[in-house]
Amino acid sequence: KQLRKPVVVLRHRPSILPILSVLTKGKEKAHLDTISNLPRQGKNGSFLSSLLRFSYYYLDYLIGQFVIYFKYILRGYVVIYDRYYFDFINDSKRSNIVLPKSITTIGYRFLLKPEFNFFLFADAKTILKRKQELDETTINELTNDYNFLFQNLQLTTNSTVYKSINNEDLETTLSNIIKTIIKK
């Protein structure tokens, strides 16, 4: 709102293609399952199944990035992803995918890069107060993985911002984001 532009919020991926469980269970049942189940609870351990699942969702990114670009970006919208492709790199288990990071990382090279990428994190105890999806060890591992990923991605470019922000205080976090956007 401070930038005086319309905003659209997308979750995790463009969602041009439905989640896979919609194809097998139907839309309502899949939606109920998504709401009632915690992330990272899938039982998939197969490389082939993971590769097929990842390929399906990657296709959604490949096609969807252009749909989002023409539908929103060119019309002046600010597009905010709550999560993005980075989950496939660092937390593919969340999508019931078990693949080496090298495979999912390569895929990022062929996607349009958001101009600004912010990883908002907090210490494990704060996160556990908000929601109990993961244990403290997993939260710490994921936080370290995302911080490391963002540091490495930032080293590869000057045209895209990859910034990790400790999200302890909302006002400070928002101020940090706005300053970063205005500065660029």
Give the role of each language-model region.
Residues 13-95:
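ATP-dependent small-molecule kinase phosphotransfer cores
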Residues 5, 112-116, 156-160:
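Short glycine-/polar-rich loops that comprise or flank the Walker A/P-loop
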Residues 77, 81-84, 110-130:
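Conserved phosphate-donor/acceptor-positioning beta-strand/loop module used by diverse small-molecule
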Residues 125-184:
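NTP-dependent small-molecule kinase module
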Residues 8-10, 116-119, 162-164:
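Hydrophobic/aromatic beta-strand patches that form the interior of the parallel beta-sheet core
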Residues 1-9:
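Post-Walker A helix-loop "phosphate-sensing" segment adjacent to the P-loop in P-loop NTPases
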Residues 15, 85-87, 123-125, 169-170:
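Short, solvent-exposed loop/turn segments at secondary-structure junctions
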Residues 102-113, 149-150:
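Substrate-engagement module of ASCE P-loop NTPases
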